Amino acid sequence: MIKKETVLDVADNSGARKVLCIGISGSKKTASIGDVITVSVKKCIPVGKVSAGSIHRAVVVRVKKRSSSSIVVFGDNAVVLLNKQNEMIGTRVFGPTDSLLRRNKGFAKISSLSQEVFQ
């Protein structure tokens, strides 16, 4: 469950390392896997596609704690940065993702680029 002001890791090679959630799409209070949120880049590498302080959209690919008591639990909260057309800014995805991205949310490209997909 991701709320506003949550610091998240970035799971792609766009250049950002840490982002801050500043908005959740829709009228929801929390975001889960597959939801699109608005983030601000807080920490990044010097040579990258994004810069610190820039605002982007992102899709949640891993969460530490789920609202339902399911078996798959990840070790961190992570997102993949998107542009305005909901396409990935980076070209690679690091770490595991959940199969909910492919099945329910329509982000099949992220699932296919990830290192491991959990059911």
Swiss-Prot record:
SMART domains: Ribosomal_L14
Gene: rplN
Family membership noted in the UniProt record: Belongs to the universal ribosomal protein uL14 family.
Organism: Neorickettsia sennetsu (strain ATCC VR-367 / Miyayama) (Ehrlichia sennetsu)
The keyword rRNA-binding is annotated on this UniProt entry: yes
CDD domains from the UniProt entry: Ribosomal_uL14 (cd00337)
GO biological process, one term: translation
InterPro entries the record matches: Ribosomal_uL14 (IPR000218), Ribosomal_uL14_bac-type (IPR005745), Ribosomal_uL14_sf (IPR036853)
The name this protein goes by in its record: Large ribosomal subunit protein uL14
Described function: Binds to 23S rRNA. Forms part of two intersubunit bridges in the 70S ribosome.
Oligomer and partners: Part of the 50S ribosomal subunit. Forms a cluster with proteins L3 and L19. In the 70S ribosome, L14 and L19 interact and together make contacts with the 16S rRNA in bridges B5 and B8.
GO cellular component: cytosolic large ribosomal subunit
MF terms in GO: large ribosomal subunit rRNA binding; structural constituent of ribosome
One Pfam family of this chain: Ribosomal_L14
The organism's place on the tree of life at top rank: Bacteria
Keyword flag Ribosomal protein: yes
Alphabetized UniProt keyword annotations: Ribonucleoprotein, Ribosomal protein, RNA-binding, rRNA-binding
Coiled-coil ranges from the UniProt annotation: none
